[in-house]
Amino acid sequence: MPSPPIDLTTLVAHGLDPALFCVDRLGFEPDPWQARLLRSKASQCILNCGRQVGKSTVVAALALHTCLYKPGALVIVIAPSQRQSRELFIKLIGFLQCLEPPEPREEETKLSLALSNGSRVVTLPGDNPRTVRGYSAPALIVEDEAAFVADETFDALIPMLAAAPDGRIVLMSTPHIAAGHFYQLWHGGGDWERYEHPTADCPRVSREWLDKRRRDDPLRFSREYECQFGNPEDSLFTVEMIDRRHNLVSVPLL
């Protein structure tokens, strides 16, 4: 039996409050910092977070809310590799499937989505700036694992927002080395709303689990779980190594 349509008052409330939308329609109860991000009006947000705090989950929800409540919106999701950008896209699709009544879709592929209201989601790899050219006036750009995306690619993203006065960009990552656009924007000035949340902030990750990771590799622990940037000479990571780490078993977020 089809679900009844959502009444206008509730629809307006969900449009105005993405955190309420997450609770009522996605079954996702945001942590306090996630609710703050969802309700933020800032056009530029940067998230320096430890692993498994829920940054991808909340940004996927924000991207879906943008698509639903801004008809004709273009959402661009970019990450160091195509597979990584698809991971956040999969989270968005998972949220989309939670909606009752269902949201009509015009087209869905492994790398993109088009809704009946004209909104689109496009996923792109961040290893080549040429792949991001050709898009304009996005409502939202999401750069996932931004510390590992090429600086030239980030430079190619920014001009897209010139024709989008209400466009937003969200950079999110675990830190890497003290270099590159993610590091510079995190520590620099500019009109960026900043969020820093080490993994210890997440109530779903146990202290015992974190203590074990710290004993295993203190240097990596400080970078991946405590939001600390490493020295450039300590860097041995490649995009392929970062891509492979996403295949590891993760602590459940929900």
Predicted features and spans:
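Phosphate/NTP-binding elements of NTP-utilizing enzymes
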Residues: 2-254
